[in-house]
Amino acid sequence: MKKGTYEDQIRIEELEVYAHHGVYPEENEKGQHFYVNATLYTNTHPAGLADDLSLSTNYGEVCQFITEFMQQHTFQLIETVAERTAYEVLQHFPLVQGLDLEIRKPEAPIPLPFGSVSVAIHREWHEAYILSLIHISEPTRP
């Protein structure tokens, strides 16, 4: 995030989701555990002053949303899981201006000892300015 914009964070750590993502058919059929870490960039100041949840992002709702999204969709790549999940969180939670999202896959089919593999991304809203230039010309005279 840019310095001075939404430096407040709501963090979700190790959200466990059982879902069916993977390149191999057995991953899609059997499913496996995924762990999600998310940092939501937002302005918590109004909610903190007023002690009012309606002025903040309800992290319980975000956890439920991520879980349901990951369980209702099947993707081959955890890169896709991360991209689509981040997009949907930004679309559904208007006070979230950006997020860091990590999808961990500790049961990945790797025939070597390992702790986990993961994809971590950062996505945020950007202001866009659209300039419309209309060129009106007079008819040419012969």
Give the positions of each predicted feature.
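N-terminal, polar/charged subdomain of small-to-medium soluble alpha/beta proteins
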Residues: M1-L133, S137
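Short "domain-exit" segments at the C-terminal end of structured domains
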Residues: E138-P142
